Amino acid sequence: MLLAHISDTHFRSRGEKLYGFIDVNAANADVVSQLNALRERPDAVVVSGDIVNCGRPEEYQVARQILGSLNYPLYLIPGNHDDKALFLEYLQPLCPQLGSDANNMRCAVDDFATRLLFIDSSRAGTSKGWLTDETISWLEAQLFEGGDKPATIFMHHPPLPLGNAQMDPIACENGHRLLALVERFPSLTRIFCGHNHSLTMTQYRQALISTLPGTVHQVPYCHEDTRPYYDLSPASCLMHRQVGEQWVSYQHSLAHYAGPWLYDENISCPTEER
């Protein structure tokens, strides 16, 4: 199994720019082109929320067109910038597993050595996350049904504070309910989130919990400064690979850079310098 995991694309309406100057649509189209050109091709691409910026139909039209050009199966979940009904209307054709209920978008993928569980942590009218009773009950049933098979959850909001002064106040408000499932089910070993626009990792019991960078703009990690900074530091995604019984995640740059070159020991340490 190999998954490419991106997040927080924040598509805008055609011709509009994010914050008035960031061409997110062009940048995301470039990301799609890079993913389509990967030498080691993923089995699927995951997008963990905030697909669009303002929840408008025109933004979802752009998102569907650009994300629809990916040459891989696509797994999508909404974030706090998304409109649930419009998300489902425009993007369900790209991810039919989401079902037809905008208030209960979730799915389980059991095609790999690790079970993949996708849930919606967004709540209309707020940037904070929330897990409904139905979502918790569904997760509990899925984890019980999966037995000892390892399970990974993809959601938008991190379920616990990460020491980020800007983003912690808008994390998942009742994430403790998910952490209680981590305690009950040893098979739940990973939780991957978007939302924070930065690569952050922590651990709760046996579960690795991580957020990842956005595809275009990033949010610097600050422990004390609550001012809402963002920047255009190089974007990246995560690649998740099943290696035997191990799950290995690594960062893949989405910036344009020179290389790669084949390693040559004679150039690395020339004979005359030995």
From Swiss-Prot:
Residues involved in Fe cation 2 binding: 50, 80, 156, 195
CC cofactor: Fe(2+); Zn(2+); Co(2+); Cd(2+)
Cross-referenced InterPro entries: Calcineurin-like_PHP_ApaH (IPR004843), CNP_phosphodiesterase-III (IPR050884), GpdQ/CpdA-like (IPR026575), GpdQ_beta-strand (IPR042281), GpdQ_catalytic (IPR042283), Metallo-depent_PP-like (IPR029052)
GO terms classed as biological process: glycerol metabolic process
Biophysicochemical property: pH dependence: Optimum pH is 5.0 for mono- and diesters hydrolysis.
Ways its activity is controlled: The active site contains a binuclear metal center, with a fully occupied alpha-metal ion site, and partially occupied beta-metal ion site. The presence of substrate promotes the formation of a catalytically competent binuclear center by significantly enhancing the binding affinity of one of the metal ions in the active site.
Biotechnological applications: Is of interest for its potential application as a bioremediator in the destruction of organophosphate pesticides and in the detoxification of nerve agents. The Ser127Ala mutant, which possesses improved metal binding abilities, has been immobilized on magnetite nanoparticles and shown to be active for multiple cycles, and could be stored over a prolonged time in the immobilized form without loss of activity. This system has the potential to be of potential use in the bioremediation of organophosphate contaminated waterways.
SUPFAM superfamilies: Metallo-dependent phosphatases (SSF56300)
Record's keyword terms, sorted: Glycerol metabolism, Hydrolase, Iron, Metal-binding
Catalytic activity annotation: a sn-glycero-3-phosphodiester + H2O = an alcohol + sn-glycerol 3-phosphate + H(+); sn-glycero-3-phosphoethanolamine + H2O = ethanolamine + sn-glycerol 3-phosphate + H(+)
Induction: Induced under phosphate-limiting conditions.
Cofactor note: Binds 2 Fe(2+) ions per subunit. Active in the presence of various divalent cations such as Fe(2+), Zn(2+), Cd(2+), Co(2+) and Mn(2+). Fe(2+) is probably the native metal ion.
Binding site for Fe cation 1: 8, 10, 50, 197
Phenotype of gene-disrupted mutants: Deletion mutant is unable to grow by using dimethyl phosphate (DMP) or the phosphotriesters as phosphorus sources.
Superkingdom assignment: Bacteria
Main function: Catalyzes the hydrolysis of the 3'-5' phosphodiester bond of glycerophosphodiesters such as glycerophosphorylethanolamine (GPE), a typical phospholipid metabolite which is probably the natural substrate of the enzyme. In addition, exhibits a broad substrate specificity and can catalyze the hydrolysis of various phosphomonoesters, diesters, triesters and phosphothiolates. Preferentially hydrolyzes the phosphate diesters over the phosphonate monoesters.
Other observations noted: Diester bonds are cleaved in two separate (non-processive) reactions, indicating that GpdQ may regenerate its active site after the first hydrolysis. The metal ion-bridging hydroxide molecule activates a terminally bound hydroxide nucleophile.
Record protein name field: Glycerophosphodiester phosphodiesterase GpdQ
Taxonomic lineage: Bacteria, Pseudomonadati, Pseudomonadota, Gammaproteobacteria, Enterobacterales
Gene transcribed to yield this protein: gpdQ
